[in-house]
Amino acid sequence: MTEFESTRDVASQLIVAAILIGVFALLAADRVHRVLVPLGAVALVWLISYFTPWRLISFEGARLAVDLNVILLLFAMMALVGVLKTTNVFPWAVDRLLVRSRGNPSRALSFVIWFTGVLSALLDNVTTVIFTYPMAASMAQRLRINGSAFLLPMVMAANIGGTATLIGDPPNVLIGADPRSGLTFLSFIENLAVACTFMLIVLVWYSRRYYPADVGSAANADRPEAIVPSGAELQNVPLLRTTAWIALAILLGFLTHSLTHMPVAVPAVIGVAAILFAQDYYYLKDHKPTAEERQHGVLAILEKDIEWPTLAFFLFLFILVGAAVSTGMIESLAHALSWTVGRISSTAGLSPRATLLVAALLVLWVSGFLSAVIDNIPYTAVTIPLVASLLGHLEAGTDGQVLWWALALGACLGGNGTLVGASANLIVAGIAERAGERIAFMRYLVVAFPLMLLQIAICHAYVLWRFF
């Protein structure tokens, strides 16, 4: 059968919506492995697409829907962390961090949250959690507390910190790259950094309240037994030094994205290829392995440290969201938002400034909720033209830049709401599952969704204070 154009009628959109609702229901029920849920959904989408009149998405459309930039970035960062593990740098760093915190869980959590938030603003939230997970998990283990008390605040801090800069979260990259927004790297920091800093403070408070026995007032005491050195020493220092220099080059590639316009996967893949070659060189030089022993070198990293199930989950999830885009479902939601703004404005006889306020708050809240249930990357890509259209209908002289900030805040922070709301959430869940610390959909939801509502409410107040 030849490839086809997706049908964009209401029936096709309702079918895709029903499938997505089913996916979330199955993930919440937690009865089957999370990878099987989107896999089965994609199979159902193609059965419908190729054997019924409703053409949801073709194979070619699915291929284009998969964000190879995200998949390759994740692969590269997982491989980089795998190489760093062979140098023993993470246990070595944890020893020193616990000494600095005097074994106090509350103080240690504050460090994890602030370190993750700042690093996420400089890199991006996905790369950050891949790097910080080994340290956060090790600190929780050494302190003998619930791993979720460190891991969930860590991933939320990554999503908050990434909101502050143009390169910290993919929605911001899309918004900043669109010439209609007119936004720069500095303008993101100027307009969003204050809000994100306050939300990190709130996250520290919320985490201590939610986990009082682990990191709250009941645990706010030094634990001398936790700062006894584990005896971890750095191994293969030449490889660590080489990896550090190449990692700095990768970071430079990330930071110059607005100038080079290279997808972030490009410097990541180039850098990790060099690192893997270096790892293989030092391994052969130091060990003189037999053919069988060599299986413990690069192949061990590729087999054990790459979260293949998580990458598969992303691949199938991208296809499902691609079906929502190709059938026009997301576009219909965006137009419904535009219609609502116009209806409220005309019915209430609002002034241009009041109309702008209504539009900004609707964009903020709708983006927050939708980004919690669908991938925020295609949502943002489809909503950018809507925001530009809303700006075109504003009266001359009205500064509509607030709509871009509302979109950025809602799309980025909405990802904190559910386990599938942001790529960083799924990465942490995948790595934790392999380590025996399973983070179920509902377990994440009951912790994170109330915080997401609080964050969006804070952004609501911030938009009013900062722009009106």
Give the ranges of each region predicted by the language model:
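Long, contiguous bundles of hydrophobic transmembrane helices that form the permeation core
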Residues: 199-301
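Membrane-embedded alpha-helical segments and adjacent helix-loop junctions characteristic
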Residues: 57-148, 309-395
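Structural signature of hydrophobic alpha-helical transmembrane segments
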Residues: 4-18, 66-79, 122-129, 165, ...
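Interfacial loop-to-helix junctions that mark the boundaries of transmembrane helices
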Residues: 3-12, 29-34, 57-70, 183-194, ...
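Hydrophobic alpha-helical transmembrane segments
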Residues: 13-17, 36-40, 71-72, 106-114, ...
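Transmembrane alpha-helix interface/packing and boundary motifs in multi-pass membrane proteins
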Residues: 25-32, 115-124, 155-167, 364-379, ...
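Hydrophobic mid-bilayer segments of alpha-helices in multi-pass membrane transport proteins
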Residues: 12-24, 31-55, 67-79, 240-250, ...
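Juxtamembrane and boundary regions of transmembrane helices in multi-pass small-molecule transporters
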Residues: 28, 145-148, 152, 163-167, ...
